[in-house]
């Protein structure tokens, strides 16, 4: 893989800049936007970026940092899903706490924002408290977003309980956007000043990157990733007016800045040190880019990937038509098309051949996989196994120089599994999934040296690109994710069945 980003340089630059910012205050509330862990978007658009860079940065500052996690009560009620992991936001909070503890980072508490006694939220609160985790409940702020006098009063932020913290940097994070991070920071700021403490607020958001051009593919890829939020990148007019320098920010931050500035000034009783929303940020990711062309190409591929993802989400009913069309429009505005993703044409062409050969209207799943050396392999679904499983077996055979004619998995192993699924468990679809085939392969590897060699090649699939001609099941997507394979799908179901699709 060609590298476009220097991870070590970025970590050094970023930690230094955060420490410089905290020197101005007794306590700094640092709003962490985006993903704290497993930032797969950043990893894809910035080749060389460590997906866990942010948490490693915090680990470096662990003596000075504690963490507050925000969760919007409405997201618990409607079981909002974190798309890249396929888990709900409340479950992601539990995962996040475990991961933070794994990096020796102190989790202060969980804040439930816009709380109004929702039943599912109360169950989640009980679950946390009975595991010894502090929980604070913040109701919707009276007067928000325009009535600054009410917001900054005992009727507004004053109604929220004060969260006791002990360290100079308080990171406020969440599973996703709209979780109430900013409101929590400002509420704390209000309480700190009421107690006579000098506290500050800053924002750490990786995208958009303020010091690369507005129409750079890296920033356009961010628009594509947040198409459901309708985020639009813009020139920060406040920054230009203050410093006569061009900086990129996004519409929500620019639109809310005048009110945010007034709130901070009302809390502190003095003029804000921030002249623009860009000033509030501490992001140094742009300084880690070492090969702009590599980053541009990776970002273009991400824009195509996002268009596929949004099309599938539209088909499933998760996003509206406007979101679907906007993702497509962003791709077209960059003069990109679906076929610019190398694995798309081989998958579609093979699927068309199979359909013609079978002379049936049924859709056949074909999965194409591009290996690190540029080789593109395909696998198709059959009565025996899914297309995802077939292409993985073909890939490990390729890496291990094993002939196509050699069976890696003995029929003695496969037949009992299929019988179990069909006869004992009563499954409608008996074809083995990718995970089931990998388990069968691992069993064979115990007695078959060839299968053992093939098993050893699985780590080589990390970072590979794949495309499926039909929508994959959640299980198949998760197996590919665990293997480190980025997969896209055509927005087509494998059959007309509504429940027994995958």
From Swiss-Prot:
The record's Gene3D superfamilies line, in alphabetical order, gives: dip2346 domain like, Domain of unknown function (DUF1846), C-terminal subdomain
Protein origin, superkingdom: Bacteria
Pfam families assigned: DUF1846, DUF1846_C
Q: Which NCBIfam families match?
A: PRK13663.1 (NF010184)
Could you tell me which HAMAP family the record lists for this protein? UPF0371
So what family is this one in?
Answer: Belongs to the UPF0371 family.
What protein name is recorded for this chain?
A: UPF0371 protein CLK_3516
């Amino acid at each position: 893989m060609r590298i476009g980003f220097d991870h070590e340089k970025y970590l050094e630059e970023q930690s230094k800049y955060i420490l410089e910012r905290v020197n101005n205050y007794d306590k700094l509330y640092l709003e962490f936007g985006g993903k704290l862990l497993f930032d797969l978007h950043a990893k894809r658009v910035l080749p060389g970026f460590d997906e866990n860079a942010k948490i490693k940065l915090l680990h470096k500052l662990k003596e000075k940092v504690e963490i507050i996690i925000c969760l919007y009560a409405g997201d618990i009620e409607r079981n909002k899903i974190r798309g890249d992991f396929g888990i709900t936001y409340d479950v992601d909070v539990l995962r996040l706490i475990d991961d933070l503890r794994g990096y020796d980072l102190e989790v202060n508490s969980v804040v439930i924002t816009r709380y109004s006694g929702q039943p599912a939220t109360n169950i989640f609160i009980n679950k946390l408290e009975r595991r010894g985790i502090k929980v604070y409940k913040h109701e919707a702020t009276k007067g928000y977003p325009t009535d600054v006098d009410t917001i900054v009063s005992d009727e507004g932020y004053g109604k929220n309980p004060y969260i006791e913290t002990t360290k100079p940097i308080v990171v406020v994070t969440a599973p996703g956007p709209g979780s109430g991070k900013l409101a929590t920071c400002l509420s704390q700021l209000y309480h700190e000043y009421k107690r006579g403490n000098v506290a500050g607020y800053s924002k750490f958001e990786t995208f958009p990157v303020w010091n690369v051009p507005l129409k750079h593919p890296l920033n356009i890829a961010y628009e594509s990733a947040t198409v459901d939020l309708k985020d639009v990148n813009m020139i920060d007019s406040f920054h230009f007016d203050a410093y006569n320098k061009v900086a990129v920010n996004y519409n929500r931050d620019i639109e809310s800045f005048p009110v945010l500035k007034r709130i901070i000034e009302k809390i502190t009783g003095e003029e804000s040190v921030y002249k623009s929303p860009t000033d509030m940020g501490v992001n140094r990711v742009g300084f880690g880019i070492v090969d702009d062309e590599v980053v541009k190409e990776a970002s273009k591929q991400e824009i195509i990937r996002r268009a596929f993802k949004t099309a599938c989400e539209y088909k499933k009913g998760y996003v509206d038509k406007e979101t679907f069309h906007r993702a497509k429009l962003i791709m077209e505005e960059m003069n990109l098309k679906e076929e610019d993703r190398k694995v798309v044409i081989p998958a579609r062409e093979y699927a068309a051949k199979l359909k013609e050969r079978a002379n049936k209207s049924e859709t056949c799943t074909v999965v194409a996989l591009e290996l690190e050396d540029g080789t593109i392999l395909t696998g198709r679904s059959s009565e025996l196994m899914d297309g995802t499983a077939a292409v993985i077996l073909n890939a490990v055979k390729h890496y291990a120089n094993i002939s196509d004619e050699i069976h890696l998995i003995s029929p003695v192993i496969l037949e009992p599994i299929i019988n179990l699924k069909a006869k004992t468990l009563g499954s409608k679809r008996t074809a083995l999934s990718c995970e089931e085939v990998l388990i069968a392969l691992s069993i064979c590897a115990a007695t078959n040296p060839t299968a053992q060699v093939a098993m050893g090649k699985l780590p080589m699939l990390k970072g590979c690109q794949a495309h499926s001609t039909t929508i994959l099941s959640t299980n198949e997507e998760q197996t590919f994710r665990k293997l480190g394979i980025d997969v896209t799908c055509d927005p087509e179901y494998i059959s007309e069945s509504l429940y027994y699709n995958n």
